[in-house]
């Protein structure tokens, strides 16, 4: 509900989105996914994750992702518990041999670099930074064996294309695809570790990480393990690989997370795969950005159209329109999670446009914002 200082405005039902969830993660979960938890997936709850029924569910996730991303020969889907946050530490222990290079342009791309800088077994990373709303050009350095950036910076709505930098040679390209995977175009052959969590484009719950790994990445994991480098078992990539190839996780996974994820993957593949998903997010984002450019009180925060994300849109408001008040009124009317990333501190709304979000609902959201602003 809105607080006492927020005007009480009741948005007409006729212009509201059919579904008012626009959060950037956790994100909208489709009703059809939820229904499987009490139907086809119900028998899996409370059963061993080392037995065939749950292992088959993990296998369904792995094979579905292999189809969705058209994996080249030798690439494997690896998974483990803990979310992308855990994978940052796992990668610091298990993918970086000596030194890494990081592009940072927001909260989440910076967090991987921070995790690496604290790891005692690798050298101080090279960190190339740009201001929020922009991004550095992917590049390499002869001293590094990992090059890392985010496909989509969730905090700012900046998307950076995934291509191996020229001259990267044997350096692994490690991409944080947490809010990009499944909604942005990618050629997996341009990456060595394309990792993500399932609570964004894949409309599931958090607490799980998945990484699509190349033969080079798998070889690197083996080579580092052979040196005897210490790593906690929970963060051990060799253990994660060994278990994943058996369609299981090192420790007990959340069945609901896997079931929701599997349903969403099947839905994406069944509708036309990644090409279909990318066209859908492109449609949604075109509606949002066109609206923002046409209004006198809004503008896209990301000024370079080539960097604007199709899956997370950030829209700045002029000073005399308080975006925070707009977000509170929207929330009081059942249109939720349009607030900006808390640490960015801008007068803006942030809108997720993952595949589960209907493009028509994005249009309805913009109509609701217009209705609210006209009455402030």
Swiss-Prot record:
Its main location: cytoplasm. The keyword Cytoplasm applies. The keyword Plastid does not apply. The modification N6-(pyridoxal phosphate)lysine is found at residue 200. GO terms for cellular component: cytoplasm; extracellular region; plasma membrane. Its EC number is 2.6.1.52. Catalyzes the reversible conversion of 3-phosphohydroxypyruvate to phosphoserine and of 3-hydroxy-2-oxo-4-phosphonooxybutanoate to phosphohydroxythreonine. It comes from Mycobacterium tuberculosis (strain ATCC 25618 / H37Rv). This is Phosphoserine aminotransferase. It comes from the Bacteria. Keywords: Acetylation, Amino-acid biosynthesis, Aminotransferase, Cytoplasm, Pyridoxal phosphate, Pyridoxine biosynthesis, Serine biosynthesis, Transferase.
